[in-house]
Every structure is written in structure tokens, then in C-alpha cells.
């Protein structure tokens, strides 16, 4: 958790870390997160540069900075708006899959795919829960949101 500690990465730093990581680990699948603090045009350019440097996947972020004004579903959309916008913009310029992460929920996961993401990251939506049953329920809910399927009731 770099942001709570005040640690901000600029584009040049992310690019250099990517190059060094790729040089050390040439055969691993490398996913790199584009910092949401960059202006959108810089996020797009960084994504292109990261692919040139060897990134196999580009991940967006942004939900940690969003402060929703509304309750309910609208608040969930407001929270996810920065990462959804980044996924839309970056997927338009990226030659590799884009993963949309940060602040996603069952309401916004389908929006991420519609925005151009190839996949989603929902770690904190699950990891913040203390109960394994609740974790399973959240994962199932997210899967249903992605597939649009609802299990048959007996």
C-alpha cells in the first residue's frame, strides 16, 4: 500500500522498474499497473511504453482515490469511475490485455469489461472480508455479474 504512505510513482519510474524487472525475469508474465495519479494522456502513453518495455498485461487503478458522493449503486459507480475511464482509454491504445482494478464491485465489474478491459482485479473486495463463506459469496456474485448468469433455485 504505497499511496497511504505517500509514495507516488511517476511514469519514468514505472517504466524503469518494468525494464529492470523484464531484464531479471525474461520468461515470466509481467503485469504492470499504470498509476492513476497521471493525467489520462500520460497513462495512455505509459501503457504503450510499458508494452514496448516488455509488459504482457497492463493494469489500471483509481478506485482508491475516488470519493463517492452518492449511496448505493450510484456510489459504487462513482468509486470505480477513475479505473473504468483508464480501462477505456488504455484499451484503445494497448496491444496487450488490460486489467481493470481498484474499487470494483458486482455493479461495476460488467462496466469494466464493457469499457474494454480483458479482465478485472477484485482483491480488496474479497481480502477485506474475515469470513471465508462471505469471500465465496462475493466471488460468486462477481462471477454472476460478469456472466450475467444466476444459479437456478431449487
Language model region names:
Residues 9-36, 74-100, 137-154:
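Alpha-helix-loop-beta-strand connector modules within alpha/beta enzyme cores
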Residues 38-53, 88-120:
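Catalytic cores of alpha/beta
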Amino acid at each position: 500500500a504505497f499511496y497511504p504512505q505517500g509514495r507516488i510513482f511517476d511514469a519514468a519510474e514505472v517504466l524503469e522498474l518494468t525494464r529492470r524487472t523484464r531484464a531479471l525475469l525474461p520468461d515470466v508474465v509481467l503485469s504492470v499497473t499504470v498509476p492513476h495519479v497521471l493525467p489520462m494522456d500520460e497513462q495512455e502513453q505509459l501503457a504503450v511504453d510499458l508494452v514496448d518495455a516488455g509488459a504482457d498485461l497492463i493494469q489500471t487503478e483509481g478506485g482508491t482515490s475516488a470519493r463517492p458522493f452518492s449511496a448505493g449503486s450510484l456510489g459504487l459507480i462513482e468509486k470505480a469511475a477513475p479505473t473504468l475511464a483508464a480501462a477505456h482509454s488504455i484499451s484503445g491504445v494497448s496491444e496487450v490485455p488490460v486489467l481493470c482494478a481498484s474499487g470494483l464491485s458486482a455493479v461495476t465489474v460488467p462496466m469494466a469489461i464493457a469499457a474494454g478491459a480483458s479482465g478485472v482485479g477484485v482483491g480488496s473486495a474479497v481480502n477485506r472480508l474475515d469470513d471465508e463463506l462471505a469471500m465465496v459469496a462475493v466471488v460468486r456474485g462477481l462471477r454472476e455479474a460478469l456472466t450475467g448468469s444466476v444459479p437456478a433455485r431449487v
